[in-house]
């Protein structure tokens, strides 16, 4: 019985290590794509962002994150309003992450530890970014769905991007009585300002 139990634990361990390496390799490739875009002086700022936005949209669970962040306003919205909101949120997310990664593009980084949250079926990958003044840790939360990996959250110094966005959006939604359609107008204007700031 002990041998069987040990063998089972060994299989789980080997399986996680293989999967963990797959996730780390995948994530590292996507990070390199983003950082390389910023370091490419032949690309305009606009083209850099569009390239990064495409990478983020393909690899982040944008729709699921958008729904979570919308909170109670989601249920009362029409299908058309929801689709508009998801599109706006994905751009908002891309602008936020692009702005953050732009600040790190000239710094060295290393993917360090990885662990698996069995309960939530999520892999957590720690990334350390080094600068002259010290280092900062980012934790990527990655989930596999339909044989693909998707980032479902980003923790900067243990602060969740998704939870922060939900709190931020809730404050903004309050001002429009949790009307997602009205909120879309505000989000669209905010995206336009962030976009102009990023590409100029």
Regions of interest found by a model, annotated:
Residues 137-163:
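Short beta-strand edge/turn micro-motifs at domain boundaries
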Residues 22-101:
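Early exported N-terminus immediately downstream of N-terminal targeting peptides
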Residues 95-139, 190-200:
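Surface-exposed, charged secondary-structure patches
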Residues 2-9:
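Sec-dependent signal peptide recognition
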Residues 156-200:
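Low-complexity, intrinsically disordered terminal/linker segments enriched in charged
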Residues 18-23, 199-200:
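Short, low-structural-confidence N-terminal segments
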